[in-house]
Regions:
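Alpha-helical transmembrane segments and their immediate juxtamembrane cytosolic regions
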Residues: 1-369
Length: 369
C-alpha cells in the first residue's frame, strides 16, 4: 500500500503551500482559493489514512503495541515542538509583524499575546498531531467498536451494496456526523473551554472522529475499500452544486433557519463535497503511484520532518525575504520552494543521520549499535 503512504506524505507536505500564505500575510485570491479547496479534503483524507494504518498495524502487532508505538512517534515530536520550536516561531512571527522584540514581553504574558499570534494559537499546526494522538490512545475503543454486532451488521449491509450506493451512504453519514460533532462541541464544551487554541483541539477531536473510524472500516472491509477507490462523476458534480448553492446563499439560509442550523448545513455541504474529493485522490494515487521508487520513498520518509518544521522555517524565511521586499505576494511565492528545500535538507543532513534527532523530530526508536 505504498501509494497510501505517498498520498499521506502529499497531504502533509502541501501544508507548506497553505501556511505560506498565513505566515506571509498575503490576501491574494489565488492562495486563498487553494487554501479553501484544500480544507475540503486534506485533514479528513489524512485521518482516514491514519485510521487505516492504525488498524493495519493493530492487526499485525496488537492494539496495545501499536498504541505505544504511536505515542512515541506522535508524542515526542509534539512535546519538542510545543515546548521549544513553537514558542520560538511565535516570538519571531510577533516580533516581525508587531515589532515587539523583547523576549520577556512574551515570556511573562501567558496566556495572552504569546498564545495567540495572528490567528494561530500556541499549538500552531501541531494541533493535528495532538488530535491523532488522542485517537491513538483511544484506539482500543475504536477497534472495540468494530467488534460489536450492530456495527458489524452495518458493515455486512454495506458489503451487499453496489459501489455507488456505498459512496452515498458513507458521504451522508460522515458529513452528518461531522455536523453533529460541531453541534455537540457547541452545546457541551463551548462554554467550558471558551474560544481559543485548546477549544479548537477539542472541536477537531470531536468532528474528525468519524473519519478515523471510517479509516478502520476502510481497512476491514474490502468492499468499502473498493468503493472509495472508485469515482462517481454524477455524485461528485451533485456534491459540488450543493456546496456552491450553500456557499452562495449562506446569508439567506442563516436568516431563514437561524445561525446554528445554517452552520450545520454549511459544514455538511463542505464535508459532503470533500468526501468525493478524497475518493478521487484514492483513485488517482492507486493508479499512478504504481511503484515505490527512490524519489517517492524519500519524499514519503521526509514528509514528517517537512510537516513539523515548515512553519518555523517559513517564518524565518519570510523574515529574511521581507528585508528585500514588502510585497507579500512575492514573499509568499518565493518562500514556498525555499521552505521545501530547507526542510528536505534538514531531514537529509541533520535529522536522519542522528538517532537522537530522529527520535525527537520523527518519533523513531533509538537504534542500537
Amino acid at each position: 500500500m505504498h501509494y497510501l503512504d505517498a498520498l499521506r506524505a502529499f497531504v502533509m507536505s502541501i501544508g507548506v503551500v497553505l501556511h505560506a500564505s498565513l505566515t506571509a500575510g498575503v490576501h491574494h485570491w489565488a492562495p486563498q482559493a487553494v487554501t479553501t479547496f484544500s480544507h475540503l479534503f486534506r485533514m479528513k483524507l489524512f485521518i482516514i489514512i491514519g485510521g487505516y494504518f492504525f488498524a493495519l498495524q493493530a492487526a499485525k502487532i496488537g492494539s496495545r503495541a501499536v498504541t505505544k508505538d504511536r505515542i512515541r512517534r506522535l508524542g515526542v515530536p509534539i512535546m519538542v515542538f510545543l515546548l521549544i520550536f513553537n514558542p520560538i516561531t511565535i516570538y519571531i512571527w510577533n516580533a516581525r509583524e508587531d515589532q515587539y522584540p523583547e523576549v520577556y514581553y512574551y515570556a511573562f504574558n501567558m496566556p495572552g499575546e504569546y498564545l495567540n499570534t495572528h490567528g494561530a494559537g500556541w499549538h500552531l499546526h501541531i494541533w493535528f498531531l495532538v488530535v491523532l494522538l488522542v485517537y491513538c490512545v483511544a484506539l482500543s475503543g475504536f477497534t472495540l467498536l468494530i467488534k460489536i454486532s450492530p456495527f458489524n451488521n452495518v458493515v455486512a449491509f454495506l458489503e451487499k451494496m453496489p459501489n455507488w450506493l456505498i459512496l452515498i451512504i458513507l458521504a451522508v453519514t460522515t458529513s452528518g456526523l461531522f455536523a453533529v460533532g460541531r453541534a455537540l462541541h457547541f452545546l457541551l464544551f463551548q462554554n467550558l473551554t471558551k474560544e481559543g487554541p485548546f477549544n479548537y483541539i477539542v472541536q477537531a477531536t470531536l468532528t474528525y472522529a468519524p473519519f478515523f473510524a471510517l479509516g478502520i472500516v476502510f481497512y476491514n472491509s474490502k468492499k468499502v475499500f473498493s468503493a472509495m477507490h472508485s469515482v462517481s462523476i454524477f455524485q461528485t458534480i451533485v456534491s459540488w452544486i450543493f456546496l456552491a448553492a450553500v456557499w452562495s446563499n449562506g446569508r439567506s439560509i442563516s436568516t431563514t433557519i437561524g445561525f446554528a442550523p445554517s452552520e450545520a448545513v454549511r459544514h455538511f455541504a463542505q464535508e459532503f463535497a470533500g468526501f468525493y474529493i478524497c475518493c478521487i485522490m484514492f483513485f488517482v494515487f492507486s493508479r499512478y503511484v504504481i511503484k515505490q521508487n527512490k524519489a517517492v520513498r524519500y519524499l514519503s520518509d521526509s514528509s514528517y520532518t517537512v510537516y513539523l518544521f515548515h512553519i518555523f522555517v517559513l517564518v524565518c524565511v519570510d523574515w529574511l525575504l521581507f528585508s528585500f521586499t514588502v510585497n507579500r505576494l512575492i514573499v509568499y511565492i518565493v518562500s514556498i520552494p525555499m521552505a521545501y528545500a530547507v526542510c528536505l535538507a534538514l531531514h537529509r543532513y541533520i535529522v536522519t543521520p542522528s538517532p537522537m534527532l530522529s527520535l525527537l523530530f520523527n518519533g523513531k526508536s533509538l537504534r542500537t549499535p
